[in-house]
Amino acid sequence: MKTFDELFAELQERARTRPEGSATVAALDAGVHAQGKKVIEEAGEVWIAAEYESDEALAEEISQLLYRLQVVMLGRGLSLEDVYRYL
């Protein structure tokens, strides 16, 4: 299990080192527009899971949304501090 901050650090490292076959690298290369679409898709899946599925399924969907949001952050060059400033 990892925290939000740990995941972000891991994704930053992947963005920096660009390991071959990395889904995160492919997502970053697809651009912010493509990742924005994925955010919308995952948000819809969170909503459906919240309405009709188990807590476990909901937690998994939320984790996927958080991942996509972090990829958008990296694509735009935002840090966690940039976001935490508004919490």
Curated annotation (Swiss-Prot):
Q: Family assignment?
A: Belongs to the PRA-PH family.
Tell me the gene name.
hisE
Q: Which InterPro entries match?
A: HisE, PRib-ATP_PPHydrolase-like
- Record Gene3D superfamilies: MazG-like
* Record-linked Pfam families: PRA-PH
Organism listed in the record: Saccharopolyspora erythraea (strain ATCC 11635 / DSM 40517 / JCM 4748 / NBRC 13426 / NCIMB 8594 / NRRL 2338)
Task: Report the subcellular localization.
Answer: Cytoplasm
Where does this protein chiefly localize?
cytoplasm
Q: Which pathway does it operate in?
A: Amino-acid biosynthesis; L-histidine biosynthesis; L-histidine from 5-phospho-alpha-D-ribose 1-diphosphate: step 2/9
Q: What is this protein called?
A: Phosphoribosyl-ATP pyrophosphatase
**Enzyme Commission code:** 3.6.1.31
UniProt KW Cytoplasm keyword? yes
